[in-house]
Amino acid sequence: MLLAVDVGNSNISIALFDREGSLRFRASLDTDRRKTADQICVDLMNLFQLYHFRYQEVSDSILCSVVPPLNFMMEKALTRLLGKPPMVVGPGVKTGLNIRLAVQTQMGADIVADAVAALEIFQAPIITIDMGTATTIGVISEGRTYEGG
């Protein structure tokens, strides 16, 4: 199973997918920059218990974050809980997405994940809408090119 974690400014969205890609559960936690890795582990363990799944059955995890102060603790918590580090969406991760922005590092990992997911489901051109703490509209043109938002 795959555990997907999206750390936003207001909430942390957590989803568990089985090997066929079906959603098994989706949950949300408050984003709290003060939490330690141990506290995050307890929160995740409680979610697995709440939804009647075993975290020991998770084979992989992926982390997407727009809250840099939480990145280290979240990575540490996922590594401790699952026994191996998560894939972290960020600079250097090969997505097959061409980004046409002057400063690509200003593009949030959540927006990259949105665009890649949209391209897995639909053919370009595509308009994406991310409704996190801030609402962001993006445009993906032919050739898997993110034009901006």
Placement of each model-derived feature along the sequence:
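Short glycine-aspartate micro-motif
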Residues: 2-6, 62, 126-130
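Short glycine-rich, Thr/Ser-proximal phosphate-binding strand/loop in the N-terminal lobe
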Residues: 2-46, 144-149
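A generic beta-sheet turn/junction motif
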Residues: 7-9, 67, 133
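Phosphate- and divalent-cation-binding pockets in alpha/beta enzyme and binding domains
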Residues: 13, 72-73
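Residue-level signal for inorganic ion chemistry
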Residues: 14, 63, 132
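Phosphate/pyrophosphate-binding loops at sites that engage ATP/ADP/AMP, CoA/4′-phosphopantetheine
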Residues: 44-60
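Short glycine-rich phosphate-binding loop at a beta-alpha junction
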Residues: 55-66, 85-87
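Phosphate-binding/catalytic loop of phosphoryl-transfer enzymes
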Residues: 76, 81-87, 93, 97-149
